Amino acid sequence: MDCLRWLATWLAILGGACLGGCAAPLAVNSVTDIRSSTGSRGIDVYEPKRRTDASVPEFAGDQLVEVRTFQNAGQGEVEMTGAACSLEATGFSATMTSPAKVRVPLYRGQSSTLAVTCQKPGYQKRMITVAPFDSTRQARLASGVNGGIVGAVIVAGIDAAADNTKNDWRYPVAKVVLEADPSGR
């Protein structure tokens, strides 16, 4: 009986430790809009060139990109609020306070990499880049994993024959991990 009690206690401790790292993301209460540097009035930063029939990337809508800041704690990373952040890309920029959601344009196969910089008193300034990924292709290839080797081979063949020019592209979450400033500033 003591062995079962011991086992139950350790399983509870282990389960609590595992679930402790699964904190829900902090709530975001507003959406930040971009500032175009191309003269565009809307989300499509290539719109002024598009009106003149210039060759520009195909506009494919927009996405709310999450910008989140974390600090290294003794047991892992902990999300924090209040960092001053900026986002820059080809044709646009935005400033926000973390956590935030920023509405950014999407261009089929040609979305710009995002440069996200965050700073907060007591932490070192940090910049990361966030590259867009082909979400259509990723979903297609992931579906083959469930079918084993045969499924993966079939999906790889389908992917090779597919017209990927109309695929949807997305950005992942911009996760900026800030390190404590050793100088204490």
What are these regions (language model features)?
Residues 1-24:
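Sec-dependent bacterial lipoprotein signal peptides
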Residues 22-185:
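Short loop/turn and low-complexity linker motifs enriched in small/turn-promoting residues
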